[in-house]
Amino acid sequence: MDPISELFTKGYTILPSLISEETCDALTKYLDRNFNEDLPYNYTKGHHQIHLPQEAADFPEEIVFNKKIHEILAEIMGSSYYMYSYTCNANIASENQPFHMDCTHYHPVDTVRKFGSPGPPFQIIVNTYLQDTDESNGSLEMVPNSHTNTYFESDEDGRIQERYIGETERCNLPKGSVIIRDKRTWHRGTINFKDKTRYMVGTGYSMAWYRLENRLKFKDCEDVFYDCPFSAWNLDLNDCGN
């Protein structure tokens, strides 16, 4: 199955070993220098979020501008999609996250049921492993086909009740592998049993018509983003404030 068909059907697709070891290692060194256990976390302590480089010297161009990734995104979302999220998961967790969805369906669930489908993705997340990742150090756990499920209950934070979780898949993959997922697909972060932080880059992309208010800030990056493969309307390229 080709990547786009798999993303539509399964809710995610995988591109193994897409990003070079050099890029992964350089970014890991940057993140190690900036990691601390007081960082914010999602759902469960240890599932931290850490800032990615905002200055041109350390900016991971191979990840953010990767041609293969953006060929897929452009075919799904057209030429005017934009990057609304630029962050990294730093996992030292001793507990799993709850299964959750990062966003709900665009229309009310009753409307989606009557229509027969929630429609194609309007937001897509691209995750990149910076190291070999498996059950020992917190591989992402996905619920295949869950992005089209409309018969479930969740709380206001997107947690899915356990009784609705069926078959799952652990994304056990080598360094530099990329997971492209419909933002509605259910998933969770898992325990990292090792004593080294597991990093997973997360860049989020949205259809042009679904405009979010948050702006991404960079410093001295005009040349870096010149002719980038997505719309830069929401990027402040000479402002490194967080």
Feature map (PLM): residue ranges:
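C-terminal/domain-terminus segments
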Residues: 44-47, 142-155, 193-204
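Non-heme Fe(II)-dependent double-stranded beta-helix
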Residues: 1-9, 15-117
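Conserved metal-binding segment of the jelly-roll/cupin
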Residues: 173-187
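Catalytic core of non-heme Fe(II) oxygenases with the double-stranded beta-helix
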Residues: 95-172, 211-216
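Non-heme Fe(II)/2-oxoglutarate
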Residues: 185-242
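Short, solvent-exposed loop/turn segments at secondary-structure junctions
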Residues: 20-21, 88-93, 104, 133-135, ...
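A structural signal for short, well-ordered beta-strand segments
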Residues: 86-88, 126-128, 201-205
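Hydrophobic beta-strand signal
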Residues: 14, 179-180, 202
